UniProtKB/Swiss-Prot annotation:
Keywords: Exopolysaccharide synthesis, Transferase. It comes from the Bacteria. This is Capsular polysaccharide phosphotransferase eps10H. The gene is eps10H. GO terms for molecular function: transferase activity, transferring phosphorus-containing groups. It is an enzyme of class 2 (transferase). Its EC number is 2.7.-.-. Stealth proteins are part of a protein family that is conserved from bacteria to higher eukaryotes. Family members were first identified in microbes as proteins that help pathogens to elude the host innate immune system. Microbial stealth proteins are involved in the biosynthesis of exopolysaccharides. Stealth proteins are predicted to function as hexose-1-phosphoryltransferases. The keyword Transferase applies. Signal peptide: none annotated.
Length: 333
């Protein structure tokens, strides 16, 4: 594959006093408690972001550009003169009438507006770490289609989870594609999806409606043209999400564009063993060993709601990352 591939990552420093004061002007009526949709946990900065960049440089040196999207912030250690780094402020991609925003949904729904972004790009959250070597073909096929591992799967509506967003995403997808079109295009029963996913799809294939897609919580290969197409067809809905200053149950999210690729059949099947989703809630010696084992090429490591000793876990997490990625990258001063 000879396509140019960029990476896009979003980041916020919730410890930044200037940013906190700006947020405080708007969040008076918002529930920001631990288990809420807009929990302060979502903005925590643990000092691990430099390891995200180290992973990119060590395990994906082929990447063209890395676009870091922030709210006029940057880590103190960041080398802004790095040849591959491009800093993007929210005002460059989001309508100024909607700013400031403190939710990932409007930000991620507008990443296709990044100036200079390539047609083929991979979107990362800042907790999605490269932990072993990856190739362009892990994300895109030789024909340039994004690679996903998926299945038919019901959406679980959790009070403070992403279920509301997924339901809204699927409502849009189901309004543009019939059930039969999705079943035909989705490649759900291909053995390359993995046995668990094929079995799951078989269980739900006779549902009256397409109930949802299984979400891997790994980086999202996307096509800029697909995001532009969905925006063209659903501008009003996506503008409402873009104007959503805090997470709102009526929002869509970035998975909409991935779901569109799946429903239209414009995707290739990815490796079901490429990576996994983990939480630090019960992290111990076995997990730190796993992080350094090379078993997974990508690990999404969520900080969780129920960490018992946050300071200890944070120190162990940083030590484990430093063991895997001890060398400073060109993205660092």
């Amino acid at each position: 594959m000879t396509k140019v591939i960029d990476f896009v990552v979003t980041w916020v420093d919730g410890n930044d006093e200037k940013w906190r004061l700006k947020k405080a002007k708007y969040d008076g009526s918002i529930n920001t408690s631990k288990y809420s949709m807009n929990s302060e946990k979502a903005y925590r900065e643990w000092g691990t972001f430099k390891y995200w960049f180290r992973g990119v440089e060590k395990f994906a040196p082929w990447v063209n550009k890395v676009y870091l999207v922030t709210d006029n912030q940057k880590p103190d250690w960041l080398n802004i003169d790095s040849d591959k780094l491009v800093l993007i402020d929210h005002k460059e991609i989001i309508n100024n009438d909607f700013l400031p925003v403190f939710s990932a949904n409007p930000i991620e729904s507008n990443i296709h507006r990044i100036p200079g972004l390539s047609e083929h790009f991979v979107f990362f959250n800042d907790d999605m770490y490269l932990t072993a070597k990856v190739e362009p073909t892990d994300f895109f096929s030789e024909e340039g289609l994004p690679k996903y591992n998926t299945a038919l799967s019901p959406i679980i509506p959790e009070r403070y989870g992403t279920g509301n967003f997924q339901i809204n995403d699927m409502e849009i997808v189901n309004s543009h594609f019939t059930r039969n079109e999705i079943l035909k295009n989705g490649k759900f029963f291909d053995p390359k999806q993995g046995l668990k996913n094929v079995v799951k799809s078989l269980l739900y294939k006779n549902s009256k409606f397409i109930c949802g897609f299984w979400e891997s919580h790994l980086p999202y290969p996307l096509l800029k043209s697909t995001m532009e197409l969905v925006w063209e067809k659903e501008k009003d809905i996506l503008e409402r999400t873009s104007a959503s200053r805090f997470r709102n149950p009526s929002d869509t999210n970035v998975w909409l564009f991935k779901y569109w690729q799946i429903a239209s059949g414009q995707y290739a099947i990815g490796n079901p063993k490429l990576g996994g989703l983990f939480t630090l809630d019960n992290a111990g010696p076995d997990f730190w060993s796993l992080l350094n084992s090379g078993k997974y090429q990508i690990m999404c490591i969520n900080d969780g709601f129920n960490i018992q000793n946050e300071e200890l876990v944070m120190n162990n997490f940083i030590n484990a990352l430093n063991s895997l990625l001890p060398e400073k990258s060109s993205f660092e001063l």
